Every structure is written in structure tokens, then in C-alpha cells.
Regions:
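Pre-P-loop entry segment of helicase/translocase ATPase cores
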Residues: 1-116
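Conserved nucleotide-state-sensing and coupling region of NTP-binding domains
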Residues: 146-216, 285-293, 393
Length: 396
């Protein structure tokens, strides 16, 4: 089950056992020394597939299967601490981060309860890597599993596809065959299917698939049923609500909700946030698993979709403890200092993208026929600094 790991809970948690296999690969350049197709080799990979699908428990803490795969088999570009600007990034395994641990459990619980997933988040927290993992992991470990990646714009879908295809290629080349799947029938820029073809042209094999489509209209969310339907950059999709409703037909059969819709949106998007805002604020109306969010204007909990504020997710070691928990008060001070450097529309944009509460993330939704800069300047005083006109005593 899920045990909270945050600034006040899970103080005895130790993350090292959960990414031990990644550490072995880093030291040796290999996951296992057993010869391919030997019994120890087969037993090793059978256990890894089990952990990637059922999760992994050490002591009283458990990570989900997706999270185990992410920590031990997913490669991503990271910035080295202390590196000079322009030095580039290095490819590494992810580190354990408590907020990601919470989100992976949220996804698993939604799937167990036949609910869907929606998240509103601050910009720059690397969630696209997790989205790619949510497509790649079941492709590798589950026969016949189908994931569909959708986005309203090609420019925003291509980076996600690139991440997925890069992972598949890395696993093909670096797991000594343990996670390698041939793609002899469908292997193009938009779709990958794990299968082989007989000399007579008959397709057979693992048959898992990752497909993608540019859903710039709601009518393009159609086709064969899928197990995970991912709406990337949902906050930029002006057809999100219609696409979400039509997408239900792809994850449901005869009233049974067997698949999962996953919508991911970022604060600060212009004009098209209404759909994501509605889904976020009224999760149960859209079959989304409700999340008790304490990061609100009055600090009273609200049932929303999942929310990750900027100050509770750091990738900088100076704001992280040994458990991967962000020291939120210190990190919030960092963002507050950055906010003090800006004003007007620039401040509004910054607060929307690096939000502390959902209201900030959604400031820019809707159309505005008035002076946006003047309004932004006043709104940022009221909304961000809580400033207002102070009453004065005067003589009549």
C-alpha cells in the first residue's frame, strides 16, 4: 500500500534499496552477469518483470511497478550539480523523488478503481519523462498492451514520442535481450508495435503497442480501444473537454472502464485552459480520481485532480533531503525572491508557470479585451502580494 513520504511523515524511509539495480548497472555496465537464456538469467528477468508490473516492497514501504521501472530502467538527461551554464546534460537514471512516488501511487490507485488521471503542475518539473515511462513500461512488460499518445500540436507531441522511442532503443541495446522486443511489422515515427512476422507474412509475438496522433480536433480521438490514453499538454488543447468525453469510448467496453485516460497540464498556458480547469476542479464529473489538495489560497483542503506546486518539487540538491523530499519552505523563499524581480504581465506569467496554488496556474485562462498589462500589474499585487488599498481616515 501507500505510505506518505513528506516533510513530516516517512522520516525512516531510505530510498537506496529501490534503485539498487540501477546502481549495479552504473557500476558494471550490465544488469546481470548470467548468460542469456540460462535458468538464472530467465529467473532474473522474470523477477524484474514482476517488480515492474506488481511493484516492489522493502520493509514497510512499497513503490509501484511503473515507479520501479522508472528508477531502474528509464534513462533521462539530467543537469549535473555545479556544472557551468552551457555544459550540456548527462544521461542518467532518475533519482528517487517523494512527489513522483506520490504521483505514481495516484496513477496506480486510479487504475485499480477504474478511474482516470488528471494533473495540473508547475512548469519545469520533468513530468514528460514520467509520461513517457507510463507508455514505455507496459509496452515492455505487458503482452498486447496499447498506449495512445495524443496532443493538439505536432510540436508538443514530437518531443514525447522522441523520449519513448529513445527508451525503447536503449532497452533493446542495454538489457542483454531481457527487455528487447523486435518490431518487424510496425516501426515508424508515429507507432511502434512489438511483433515478428513469419515468412508467410503472418504477424505474431508480444503485440504491445505505442501509437500517437495529433488530436487538433476532438474527432481524431477515435480508433481501437487502448489501455492508456494520454493527453499530453492538455492545458494547450482547446478541444480537451470534447476529446476527453470522446476518448471514453476508447477505454470503456459495455460500461466497464478497463483503460485509463491521463491528462497532463501545465500552469501558464494561454487561452485553452478552460477544459483542463473544469476537469481539475470537478474531477468526479469527469471520472477522475479526486485528490485532497492542501495547497490552496486559504490552506483548506479541496478535492481536485492531482496538483504539484513549484515549491514542493525541487530538482536541486540544496532543497532536497536524503529521502528525496523537497524542503518546501526554503524552496518557496527561492521562488518568492524571483517574483520580487518582476512586475506586471511578466510577474503574472512567472507565477502562472511556477505556481504555488491552482489559482495561480490558471490565471491566464479565458479571453481578455481590456489592458492585459495594466490588469496584470494590479492582479499580481492583489493575488500574489495580497496588497490592496488601505482605508484612510479623513475629515468630512
Amino acid at each position: 500500500g501507500y505510505r506518505p513520504i513528506n516533510e513530516t511523515q516517512g522520516l525512516d524511509f531510505y530510498p537506496t534499496p529501490f534503485n539498487e539495480l540501477a546502481q549495479i548497472y552504473d557500476r558494471t555496465g550490465s544488469y546481470t552477469e548470467y548468460p542469456a537464456d540460462s535458468k538464472p538469467y530467465n529467473d532474473f528477468w522474470k523477477e524484474q518483470y514482476k517488480r515492474c508490473t506488481e511493484g516492489y516492497t522493502v520493509g514497510k514501504y512499497r513503490i509501484t511497478g511503473d515507479h520501479y521501472f522508472f528508477l531502474n530502467f528509464y534513462r533521462m538527461e539530467v543537469i549535473s550539480e555545479g556544472a557551468r551554464g552551457g555544459a550540456g546534460r548527462n544521461e542518467k537514471f532518475p533519482t528517487f523523488l517523494a512527489k513522483q512516488y506520490e504521483f505514481f501511487h495516484y496513477v496506480e490507485m486510479a487504475e485499480r478503481l477504474h478511474k482516470d488521471v488528471a494533473i495540473l503542475k508547475a512548469r519545469g518539473i520533468g513530468l514528460s519523462e514520467i509520461v513517457a515511462c507510463l507508455a514505455v513500461r507496459p509496452y515492455i512488460t505487458n503482452r498486447g498492451y496499447r498506449s495512445l499518445l495524443t496532443c493538439a500540436a505536432e510540436g508538443k507531441l514530437t518531443p514525447l514520442k522522441t523520449k519513448c522511442w529513445k527508451q525503447l532503443n536503449w532497452l533493446d541495446m542495454n538489457t542483454n535481450g531481457g527487455m528487447r522486443h523486435l518490431r518487424q511489422k510496425v516501426n515508424n515515427a508515429d507507432t511502434k508495435r512489438a511483433s515478428q512476422v513469419t515468412p508467410d507474412g503472418v504477424e505474431y509475438g508480444w503485440m504491445s503497442e505505442i501509437d500517437s496522433v495529433i488530436a487538433d480536433t476532438s474527432d481524431k480521438i477515435r480508433g481501437d480501444r487502448v489501455d492508456r490514453l494520454i493527453y499530453e499538454e492538455a492545458g494547450s488543447n482547446k478541444y480537451l473537454t470534447k476529446s476527453w468525453i470522446k476518448g471514453n469510448a476508447l477505454v470503456e467496453l459495455g460500461g466497464y472502464h478497463f483503460g485509463t485516460r491521463i491528462a497532463l497540464g501545465t500552469g501558464g498556458d494561454d487561452m485553452a485552459l478552460e477544459g483542463l480547469s473544469n476537469i481539475f476542479a470537478k474531477p468526479e464529473g469527469y471520472n477522475v480520481l479526486p485528490y485532497k489538495n492542501y495547497d490552496t489560497e486559504d490552506r483548506k483542503p479541496q478535492l481536485t485532480a492531482f496538483f504539484i506546486p513549484a515549491h514542493k518539487f525541487s530538482l536541486r540538491e540544496e532543497f532536497l533531503d536524503t529521502r528525496g523530499v523537497t524542503q518546501s519552505e526554503e524552496f518557496k523563499k527561492f521562488y518568492e525572491e524571483e517574483r520580487k524581480k518582476l512586475s506586471g504581465k511578466d510577474l503574472l506569467d512567472y507565477c502562472a508557470e511556477h505556481c504555488f496554488i491552482p489559482n495561480e496556474a490558471l490565471y491566464k485562462q479565458g479571453e481578455n479585451i481590456f489592458d492585459s498589462i495594466a490588469i496584470a500589474d494590479r492582479l499580481t499585487q492583489i493575488r500574489i502580494f495580497k496588497a490592496g488599498l488601505k482605508p484612510e481616515y479623513v475629515s468630512l
